[in-house]
Amino acid sequence: MAANKDEFSVKQIFPKLGGERGARNPRYGPTSSHDLVEQMEFLYVQVIQAINNSVVNPSARICCPVVEITLGNYKSSTKNLPMGPNMDWNQVFAFDKSKGDVLSVTLKDGPTNTVINKRNFKLASEIPTRVPPDARIAPQWYSMHNTETDFYMELLMSVWFGTQVDEVYPEAWFSDACEVCASRVINTRPKVYLAPRLCYVRVTIVSGHDLISKDKNKTPSVYVTATLGKVALKTKVSSGTNPSWNQDLIFVASEPLEGTVYIRLIDREDEQHEGCIGTLKKKLTEMTPLKVPSSAPALFYDIEMPTEVKPAGDSRRFASRLKMKLATDQAYHVAEECTQYSSDNRAFVKGLWPGLLGKLEIGILGATGLKGSDEKKQTIDSYVVAKYGNKWARTRTVVNSVSPKWNEQYSWDVYEKCTVLTLGIYDNRQILEDKNKANDVPIGKVRIPLNRVQSDWIYTCSYPILKLGSSGLKKMGELQLAVRFVYVAQGYARYSAPFRWMLPKAHYKSPLSMYQIDKLRAQAVEINCANLARTEPALRSEVVSDMLKPKSRNFSIRISKDNFDRLYTVVKMVLWCVSVIASVRSTTACTPKFIALGVSFVFLFWEYYIYWLVTSWLVAYCIVLCIVVILLREILKSPRQTYNWLFYRNVTPPPLILVDLKLRKLDSINLDELAEEFDSFPSSENDLNILRMRYDRLRKIMENVMLLMGDAATQGERLLAAFTLLERPFVLIILLALCYCSMLVVCLGWDLHVRKCLIFVFICYWVQLPWFRNNLPDGSLNFFRRLPSNEDLMF
């Protein structure tokens, strides 16, 4: 199965950003707060309050007003909105400006559905336009009288044309979501979330003292459990009245650090029975805050013992004690993402943060050709979530559209450029009453590494949303983005940033193991899910966990081939140099051999002339000439772009390449390899023939790996065997004699010319001139091949 390269490639687009005001690529920061998105014009209608002034008809005094707003085929209403005690709603409705010519506002009596009055506004002449930072349009009272029913009402509202820059945009009820239940409209609104920063809590259980078992005739076998929130960890079992553990139990907590760690000592009486012999609880605020890489002091803590284990017959106070180190490790960065997709490396304490490096700005323009997981559903209620650091941004939900337009702009502070911005697009399942328990469905993700983004450029591209499954590579649509990174730091702070530590110093002074980092990352994801689920509107747990989902570690032949090709690309240049040198030795032609000897002779005996050539003006003139030729070649290659860059600083950068199909082995996909990659563990494949075929294929691959590993081990064992020969006295005597002869040659050849002659003779022998040529193996190589290895001992 071959993938279409053009279909899955990043395409360059040319939107009218910010109405094309100002430069496309400013050199000194953004021109406005919304210059990375296209301007969208909306008709805003703010319905604030209604007043009933009916005095003639007593029945008209009892009125439940409902406001209906109509523009073209779109209709919105306050029917399902909660009404205040003074008949107030204070709700903003937003309509697409191009959907009609006349805006109709109708006031009705809700129970009887009686029309009280109607107001029509012509869009072309009667509605003002407001562009921030202009002051907001003042609301007006509109008389809504009905002489037939004796209703005398007044409606307070305001109508104006605005854009997505307007302050009411995040709280507006858009016309495309008019069918959404009023209680669910909040789930369609854009929002920015700040996830609480995370911190490690280190509980080091050192030892116990004077522990008492429930069974007075038995030596206690105790382990310690510590619980913080929903996470419980325990130590190994240690026996004795004064057991020792010296074991770290590490938790993840979020700011503010207000939790409590509950510690219990469990006595293992036998294989099936256990009993608690002591408890202790400590608040996080009572622990030692470590703001530098260090260790907390070890202190003794009295344990609260159950009554059944207290010593009898002694009225004096007796307490078992537990020696522990309790600290909040604030000098670490808590990883919630995998290393490849990390967006933040800062420590918990702000005093250890590096200086601000720059600003990242993202304009989420829209999407095209979206496909959901449910093929029967023709439309999608989509929204985008962008995550960088602890700041999450969520766009509004565009209802019933496979090509939504958002045009929302967000920005982040950047402290490390070697990070990744993650954007995910999801199908909103929370906007209908019958979808209360449904989860939002992920459509796909786009990741942008910042180290590939050049500063002060605006990248306007359409990124494919790719989904790889057992059936192959599938395109779920395209996400249109405008990306810009602007440096804030200048001078030394900017140019020294690539050389500073990527992680806080504590990660290098007291590093955590990969196993610990993976376990703590799982804790961090759960805490983030819980914290963001408590916001309003909630960023659901399935969305957060999907955004923080790490790379799969399942076995994949496709990725194995990919990693081999990457490794081969890295060492290909070294292999090329080795092959060139080997070809000089092995060739029978005299020309390359004499060229090598000539170059060696010049560098050995004519170094004075080389020094004169380097320090002369001739070399400087040649370098300047080469620079001029290179610049002229670039200018003549693309004269239009050079002209724009010189006079307007306006050059369209090339699109960011986020996925290399050929590198990832996605240009020609083997479906069975994909099926094996996405198979569960243990395998859920029931066809024995397929399992046998996969097993035989893996055996063939591992056969080559086995032989390669065996050859490498054999050569390494022969090298070790050469050192073991030094244990024999005869070999040691010969080695000392050779060392003495070598020193004698060096001393005799200490004269500069003699040493150069010796080196030149060695080079002549090494390049194998015709009179030195011998196709038989060298003596040292013969000796090395005769050294023993453990391969002879294997059965």
Swiss-Prot record:
Q: Which domain of life is it from?
A: Eukaryota
- Record Pfam families: C2, PRT_C
The cross-references to InterPro entries, in alphabetical order and at most eight, read:
C2_dom, C2_domain_sf, C2C_MCTP_PRT_plant, C2D_MCTP_PRT_plant, MCTP_C, QUIRKY-like
Q: Where in the cell is it found?
A: Endoplasmic reticulum membrane
Sorted alphabetically, the keyword list is: Calcium, Endoplasmic reticulum, Membrane, Metal-binding, Repeat, Transmembrane, Transmembrane helix
One GO cellular-component annotation of the UniProt record comes to: endoplasmic reticulum membrane
Q: What's this chain's function? A: May function as a signaling molecule by regulating the trafficking of other regulators.
So what family is this one in? Belongs to the MCTP family.
Q: What is this protein called?
A: Multiple C2 domain and transmembrane region protein 12
Name the species this protein comes from: Arabidopsis thaliana
